[in-house]
Design a protein with these regions (language model features):
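Short beta-strand segments at enzyme active-site cores
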Residues: 106-111, 173-177, 208-209, 326-328
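A short, structured active-site edge motif that brings together acidic residues
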Residues: 135-149, 176-178
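N-terminal binding-site loop/beta-alpha segment at the start of enzyme catalytic domains
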Residues: 2-139
């Protein structure tokens, strides 16, 4: 990586102290190195908001000849896995159609997200029957495979992928994102080599990772696996991916897809000016995600500092006429190596189409960034507290 890219990583990727000037300079330098960046994306007001929003909607992931274009705001379907309320199949599919009709046409799921893959199969068939070919061409279904700790034989890997293909009713998976629990078991390389072979047979279009750390990503790439992206937890509070991981990604062209970007809903007006230290005084932490990300807040700096962050984000949101979640997502999309950010969808229960689409036209200026960083710099460096990307899932 050249000196410009390294200075960008140091100026904006670590949880050190930043200045608006260094941020703006880094953005200008990095834009010239990244095809996806919109001119003056994060450093000056947009002269044509509509054009900027259109150009900023989609991102091309690639490794060699493998390519996949996705919407930069992805619909996360983990909330179909239980714990967020009962999902009605018909209502869920109608909601998916609404998201796709409004340009939010990339869906992220997994083999273990309850009926997510089955819902996608019903949805994609309705798109084929009821929507114009132009919309079908933009729809993407990204799934994950989280195998048990067994020997990764060719037949086992192939049969597992065939299950997802049948459930999603596609000849080839747009993207298979691979997860592995235990790094001491090198079977992950065997699995990825089999997945690469299946890609060559036309059963998978692109291979990606989820929750892998920087060292394992390096090993995987050195073994010739054509990884296009790594899905990791990344938010204004959790900036770990902007340390070692982003540097390797900039060197190799691998992109980041982020989840936890609105922290399960904690980064929203709902939790502004609340006191969770008093039982029943504030909104209930009544989903697995809210409980998980509240623990992340505690590790980062506590509820009082988090309230200061929410107040700052609210000021920025009011300035631009958007919501706190919209600001939170835009901030992460502007980070080096980030191709897209996930927002969880409670299909048939609630929707965030307006807020999600507002992300594309939002331009955070130097003052906005400076005000946000003044707060986040007070928090702990979670790389030191938790470890690298995905380490939270592998701690003893």
């Amino acid at each position: 990586m050249g000196s410009t890219a390294i200075s960008t990583q140091q100026a904006f990727c670590s949880l050190q102290k930043f200045t608006p000037l260094s941020y703006a300079s880094s953005c200008r330098s990095l834009r010239s190195r990244r095809k996806w960046a919109v001119p003056a994306r994060c450093c000056s007001p947009a002269t044509d908001v509509a054009t900027a929003a259109k150009e900023n909607r989609r991102e091309l992931l690639k490794n060699g000849d493998d390519k996949l274009e996705i919407c930069r705001v992805l619909n996360g379907m983990w909330q179909t896995s239980g714990g967020w309320g009962r999902i009605d199949r018909n209502d869920a599919v109608e909601a998916m159609l609404n998201y796709a009709d409004d340009g939010l046409s990339t869906f992220d799921m997994a083999d273990h997200y309850g009926p997510a893959e089955d819902l996608y199969g019903i949805f994609i068939n309705r798109v084929r029957r009821e929507r114009p070919p132009e919309l079908l061409e933009t729809v993407r279904g990204l799934t994950k495979w989280v195998p048990p700790p067994v020997k990764m034989t060719r037949s086992f890997v192939s049969e597992s992928i065939d299950v997802s293909r049948r459930r999603m009713d596609v000849a080839a998976l747009d993207m298979l994102q691979f997860h592995w629990w235990d790094y001491s078991n090198p079977g992950y390389l065997d699995a990825l080599k089999h997945l690469t072979d299946l890609k060559g047979e036309g059963k998978i279009k692109t291979i990606a990772l989820t929750n892998f750390d920087t060292e394992r990503l390096r090993i995987i790439l050195e073994n010739g696996i054509p990884v296009v992206s790594n899905q990791v937890q990344h938010s204004i509070v959790d900036m770990r991916p902007q340390q070692k991981m982003a540097e390797l990604c900039q060197l190799t062209g691998v992109k980041l897809i982020t989840y936890g970007t609105v922290m399960g809903g904690l980064l929203s007006e709902k939790f502004l000016d609340t006191n969770l230290t008093i039982p029943f005084a504030g909104p209930a932490l009544n989903t697995p995600s809210l409980q998980k990300y509240k623990r992340m807040v505690d590790a980062w700096g506590g509820w009082s500092l988090f309230q200061e962050l929410l107040r700052t984000l609210k000021t920025v949101a009011n300035k631009h006429g958007v919501s706190i979640p919209t600001v939170a997502v835009r901030f992460i999309l502007d980070q080096p190596a980030v191709a897209g950010s996930m927002i969880g969808v409670r299909l048939g229960l609630s929707q965030h189409i307006k807020d999600a689409n507002a992300v594309f036209s939002l331009v955070l200026d130097v003052e906005d960034i400076s005000n946000i960083l003044q707060v986040t710099n007070k928090g702990r460096d979670l790389q030191k507290v938790i470890g690298d990307c995905g380490d939270e899932y592998r701690r003893a």
